[in-house]
Structure formats: C-alpha cells, structure tokens
Design a protein with these regions (language model features):
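Sec-dependent signal peptide recognition
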Residues: 2-8
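A beta-rich soluble binding module of mature secreted/lumenal proteins
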Residues: 17-186
Length: 186
C-alpha cells in the first residue's frame, strides 16, 4: 500500500502536463468590445452542450471586474427545453485580457483562452490548453462556408482533432440560416 501511495504522489506533478506545445492567445483583447452576444457556430462540446441548438454565449462586465456570462441553448432540437448556465469569468492575464478562468462551480476555474479574434470583433475562437473543448463563435448565427472552413482549419493548426467538431444548428426567425441542422464539419 505504501508503494502505491508513493507512486500516486510522485505522479501528481505530472497531472497538469500536456503533450502539446503551449497554446498561444491573441495579443490583446479590448474587453469592452468583446462583451455582448456570441453565437456558438461550432465546437468540440462539453457533455452539457452535445446536442445544443441556437447556442449563444453572452458576456457583460461586473463592477468587480469579473465577467458575467450567460450561456443559453435549446436542448436536443429547435423545440427543445431552453437551458441556461451562468458561469463567471475572471481575467487572469490583464496585459492581454485573453486568458480567463471560467468558474461554473466554486472554487474551480476552467481554462478559457481567446486564441483567435478578428480585427472587427465579429469572430472568435475560444480554446483550452488541454485541447479537449473548443468554441468557434460569431456575432451572427451564420458564417459563409469559406469563413467557417478557415476557422476550422485554424482550430486544427493549434492542435485540435477537427474530426470531433460539431456544427451547432441555428434557426432564428429574422436571420437567413446557412447552417441549420448541420451537425458535421462539412
């Protein structure tokens, strides 16, 4: 038993190690411009969002500097139950504002990295150092196929297995939808 405990204890420092190169973030995020609604276009989903439709992540600044986050989606179909989660974001790197901790349950803050952000703040990619989950998001629920493919290729270039990507279905009454009911990467 003592050998087992010693072996286990000796492996603890390796727990956080990854076989990937460190994941770079964007150089700088203007937090005020980043706030607002982001449609989740595609992802490698967590178990909570595996069959999400009309997924939207919304951010707003709290007076204490944290980020109030509202993640909503319809579960299973466009007629599915509306789900809502409210994690709190914490900016961990105030020089770039691109490295956050996202807290769903106290005291755990999940890794949240803004790894891509276009100049006009209309498209972003959120990644994690472990490369287990990723989110492609945009200010509109529709991207052209060319834009979508470019973003998916970027996800692949930073070490993700893009065969695990899901395209999130969107159907909004006032928007022409180009990716409705598409679950595969295309």
């Amino acid at each position: 038993m003592n050998r087992f405990v010693m072996l286990t204890m000796s492996l603890i420092p390796l727990y956080g190690c990854s076989h990937h190169a460190p994941m770079a973030t964007v150089d700088y995020v203007d937090v005020d411009r980043f706030m607002g609604d982001w449609y989740v276009i595609a992802n490698i989903p967590t178990f909570l969002e595996e069959d999400a439709h009309n997924a939207v992540e919304s951010y707003s600044k709290n007076t204490d500097g944290s980020i109030a986050t509202t993640f909503t989606f319809l579960d299973g179909s466009f007629d599915g139950e509306r789900k809502e989660y409210n994690p709190r974001g914490y900016i961990k790197d105030t020089e770039s504002n691109a490295l956050w901790g996202m807290q769903f349950i106290w005291p755990i803050k999940a890794d949240y990295r803004i790894v891509y952000l276009d100049a006009d703040y209309t498209k972003t990619i959120i990644g994690r150092e472990a490369r287990d989950y990723v989110w492609i998001m945009a200010r509109t629920p529709v991207l052209s196929q060319e834009e979508y493919e470019e973003l998916v290729q970027f996800v692949g270039s930073i070490g993700y297995d893009i065969s695990k990507m899901n395209r999130v279905p969107h159907s909004w009454p006032d928007q022409p939808i180009g990716n409705k009911d598409e679950k595969e990467m295309s």
